Amino acid sequence: MTSVTMRQMLEAGVHFGHQTRYWNPKMAPFIFGARSNIHIINLEKTLPLFNDAMKYLEQVAANRGKILFVGTKKTMRKVIEEEARRCGMPYVNHRWLGGMLTNFKTIKASIARMKDLQAMRDDGRLNRFSKKEALGMMRELEKLVCNVGGIGDMDRLPDVMFIIDTGYEKNAVSEARKLGIPVVGVVDTNNSPVGIDYVIPGNDDSIRAVQLYAQSAATAILRGKASGVDFGAVADEFVEMEPETEQGATGETLGG
């Protein structure tokens, strides 16, 4: 399991919440106190919840589940993309389009259009059009890549969503709840933990904190993928063996 220490959380500023006047009373159980009108999050509450969330992501990945990373604030766009790509998961890091999940059929059409334009660009078919038409298509492609590029290989709805700043991404949370998709979410002191399946009480503005969350999630997912057994591949190995070899291998396994 991903191992993060209290010291790492402190160094990343996970404990710094928002100004006390903006607090959400439902976050009271996770608040240690206040300093200079800034709420301080109780990391003794955060750390075990964080570990539970990472363990859950690891288990989902071990079962070949799809985990959608969501973080569209400018400060976190780069790290969301980097870490989602590192663990081979889809991501949304620019703008959450309305109906991205609840109207996934339409989103899939946009993904198909993006791939068509990419193919036309790569094989030279765009050169058959006038410069004006080709420029228009390239602009369309840029917009599509920005909006759906991170979910280009997501052929079905995700099994879980990993969201940093559930308040800012309230539309994503809402769609997940409508569809019954579990949410692992970083919730700061100004937002509500209600409706979040795995709450991570923590700073959602500090880039170091965001890096800690995203890197830990990606690492947990990679560990889960590595631990997952590909039963199909195992079955294929036995099918391809000669009868006497299969018997020997089976006997060796049982004996070992």
Swiss-Prot record:
Gene3D superfamilies xrefs: Glucose-6-phosphate isomerase like protein, domain 1, Helix hairpin bin
Domain of life: Bacteria
Record carries keyword Ribonucleoprotein: yes
InterPro entries named among the record's database cross-references: Ribosomal_uS2, Ribosomal_uS2_bac/mit/plastid, Ribosomal_uS2_CS, Ribosomal_uS2_flav_dom_sf
PROSITE patterns (alphabetical): RIBOSOMAL_S2_1, RIBOSOMAL_S2_2
Gene Ontology CC annotations of this record: cytosolic small ribosomal subunit
Keywords for this protein: Ribonucleoprotein, Ribosomal protein
GO molecular function: structural constituent of ribosome
GO BP terms in the entry: translation
Protein family membership: Belongs to the universal ribosomal protein uS2 family.
NCBIfam families xrefs: rpsB_bact
Family annotation (PANTHER family): 30S RIBOSOMAL PROTEIN S2 PROKARYOTIC AND ORGANELLAR, SMALL RIBOSOMAL SUBUNIT PROTEIN US2M
Stated name of the protein: Small ribosomal subunit protein uS2
Species annotation: Methylococcus capsulatus (strain ATCC 33009 / NCIMB 11132 / Bath)
